[in-house]
């Protein structure tokens, strides 16, 4: 089939790479415009844009795809000219309007990193880890006008390990999900795809803000650990020590329970922090404006280790 691939971040690159190895023809990619990154705030293309350029594939970067806008109208004209059979989508980042959904024979097919209808929304991997789910997966579905409510075309399952960060889990899902999406494209091309309605209670995973990533030390140690892993590497779990922000993680749950929530104790090679029940041991810490380091190395540089409280 002729495809326009819609995606933006690194996990989408894994999927695009797999599509480029398949029998399908990627005639263009649709991705977010170049964004400013780094200390110099210089413009950089999205990861998907970079891969497409390496393969000589046309890159479409409208600021919006809404109708009756210059960018949106130009995209619609190019969509008609390219005449794709299907538009596979992986974390594109823009709302797809209903007229566009109906403009492609096989529609816009999304690869979503959860077992729908559980964890609809922008942060399904993070939500699964934070909730303590022991398994998750990926779903391909035809996008409709709802939020991740469309008919399902395929699923794969993935166990969640007790040490998984969001990055660990998303990396595995990107690779297994890439195979799922190619299989879905194959089935659509061969006319053997089957659609099924989503069954079960829907739960939601909204985008995680920096404030959401702040550690609540009054929560139980296991919940603190899950929270930290869920927001690693981005936006990154953090806490304040005085007026300085520290990024924290990974951590491990200790056996002791003698510290009050947020209170720290420095031992020879350990940095312990109290939670709502057991203490946790910090493995790594990143002071504001500095590189990540071992928590024990950071502690050795302190002049005063008494009365330290994270909040």
Swiss-Prot record:
User: What is any one of the record's Gene Ontology cellular component terms?
Assistant: cytosol
A matching Pfam family: Formyl_trans_N
Q: What SUPFAM superfamilies does the record point to?
A: FMT C-terminal domain-like, Formyltransferase
Q: Where does (6S)-5,6,7,8-tetrahydrofolate bind?
A: 114-117
**Kind of enzyme, top EC level?**
transferase
Please provide the record's keywords in A-Z order: Protein biosynthesis, Transferase
Task: State what this protein does.
Answer: Attaches a formyl group to the free amino group of methionyl-tRNA(fMet). The formyl group appears to play a dual role in the initiator identity of N-formylmethionyl-tRNA by promoting its recognition by IF2 and preventing the misappropriation of this tRNA by the elongation apparatus.
What EC number(s) are associated with this protein in UniProt?
2.1.2.9
Which InterPro entries does this entry report, sorted A to Z? Fmt (IPR005794), Formyl_trans_C (IPR005793), Formyl_transf_N (IPR002376), Formyl_transf_N_sf (IPR036477), Formyl_transferase-like_C_sf (IPR011034), Met-tRNA-FMT_C (IPR044135), Met-tRNA-FMT_N (IPR041711)
**Family membership noted in the UniProt record:** Belongs to the Fmt family.
Q: Which reaction does it catalyse?
A: L-methionyl-tRNA(fMet) + (6R)-10-formyltetrahydrofolate = N-formyl-L-methionyl-tRNA(fMet) + (6S)-5,6,7,8-tetrahydrofolate + H(+)
Q: Name one GO molecular function term.
A: methionyl-tRNA formyltransferase activity
**Name of the protein this chain belongs to:** Methionyl-tRNA formyltransferase
């Amino acid at each position: 089939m002729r495809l326009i691939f819609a995606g933006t971040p690194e996990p989408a690159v894994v999927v695009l790479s797999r599509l480029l190895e398949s029998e399908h023809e990627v005639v263009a990619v649709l991705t977010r415009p170049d964004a400013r990154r780094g200390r110099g705030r210089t413009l950089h293309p999205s990861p998907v844009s970079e891969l497409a350029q390496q393969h000589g594939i046309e890159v479409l970067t409208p600021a919006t795809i809404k109708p009756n806008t210059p960018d949106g109208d130009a995209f619609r004209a190019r969509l008609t000219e390219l005449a794709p059979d299907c538009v596979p989508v992986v974390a594109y980042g823009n709302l797809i309007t209903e007229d566009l959904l109906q403009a492609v024979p096989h529609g816009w097919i999304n690869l979503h990193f959860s077992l729908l209808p559980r964890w609809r929304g922008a942060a399904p991997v993070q939500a699964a880890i934070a909730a303590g789910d022991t398994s998750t997966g990926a779903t391909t579905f035809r996008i409709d006008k709802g939020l991740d409510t469309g008919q399902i075309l395929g699923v794969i399952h993935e166990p969640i390990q007790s040490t998984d960060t969001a990055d660990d889990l998303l990396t595995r899902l990107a690779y297994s999900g890439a195979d799922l999406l190619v299989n879905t494209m194959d089935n659509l091309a061969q006319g053997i795809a089957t659609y099924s309605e989503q069954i079960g209670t829907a739960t939601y995973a909204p985008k995680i803000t920096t404030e959401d990533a702040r550690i609540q030390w009054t929560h139980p140690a296991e919940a603190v650990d899950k929270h930290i892993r869920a927001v690693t590497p981005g936006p990154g779990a953090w806490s304040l020590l005085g007026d300085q922000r520290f990024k924290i993680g990974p951590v491990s749950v200790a056996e002791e329970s003698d510290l009050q929530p947020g209170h720290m104790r420095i031992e020879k090679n350990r940095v312990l922090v109290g939670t709502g029940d057991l203490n946790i041991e910090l493995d790594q810490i990143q002071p504001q404006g500095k590189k990540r380091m071992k928590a024990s190395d950071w502690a050795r540089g302190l002049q005063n280790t008494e009365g330290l409280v994270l909040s």
